[in-house]
Amino acid sequence: MQLSYKLRKVFTGDAVTSARRHVKQWFLGRAPLRFDAAKITKTVDPEKFRAIYERYGVEDPGDHWPKYLDLQTWMEINLKRVRDLGLDLGGRKRVLDIGCGTGYFLYICQYLGHDVLGMDLDVEPGFTEMVELLGVKRVIYRIEAFEPLPDLGRKFDVITAHMICFNGHKSDKLWTSAEWEFFLDDLAEHQLEPGGQICLELNREYDDSLYTPELKEYSEARGAEIHTQRIHFNPLLPAPAATATTAR
């Protein structure tokens, strides 16, 4: 293994994640399932995917949604997310992915035998077609500040949100710890199984920041481990009393 890769693992927190995976493997007495992104990609109907690509694919999509039609790349990215959460180890979980997009993350989870549900807006026909192609269940809902999520009929062991935009991303309404507190408390009370985990992945703002010092401090006070853009609660701790009083 190259030295540069080892150093990158240390400084991004990947070393901690890797160590925990090894401990969990030892505790469970099993190795992770042997599969890779290429193997999973081959399970997607090539003719149906090609038809979607021909409708929406562009040579240089930039930051626009057709970039997600680079199937192999995004399968690799989402497989890493799955492994970082230990979803390739242990038993069957219920997984909710908020802002599920094309559904790749949930497709891999479903491939591993997990019970999955996505949540997103219905604004990009290409996302809808990909979710349908992958056979991923999805509910349509717009997340708003200080508004609870709908009753989904069950609770989840793992709740994720990748490349988040619902937090007022790149606007003058970027969420503070008060909005995040309402959101997290709502998840904890109505959507999350006791002891479940929440993993949030933030996008960079115009100033290239991922979160304010206030949000970082608040998240860590609730038990989060922060690795670059990823804020991982495992488990989520109650809100600090001072913040809870202020938010209300």
Question: For each predicted feature, which ranges?
Answer:
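A short SAM/SAH-binding and catalytic strip from SAM-dependent methyltransferases
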Residues: D157-S177
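Conserved SAM-binding loop of SAM-dependent methyltransferases across substrates and taxa
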Residues: T102-L112
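A short acidic, Gly/Pro-enriched loop at the edge of an enzyme's catalytic core
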Residues: L149-V158
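Conserved beta-strand signature within the Rossmann-like core of class I S-adenosyl-L-methionine
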Residues: P194-L202
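Class I SAM-dependent methyltransferase SAM/SAH-binding core
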Residues: Q110-K137, E144-A145
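A short glycine-rich, Lys/Arg-flanked "PGG" loop and its adjoining helix->strand segment in the class I
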Residues: L174-P194
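Conserved alpha-helix/loop element of class I SAM-dependent methyltransferases that forms part
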Residues: L71-R92
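Conserved class I S-adenosyl-L-methionine
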Residues: R92-G101
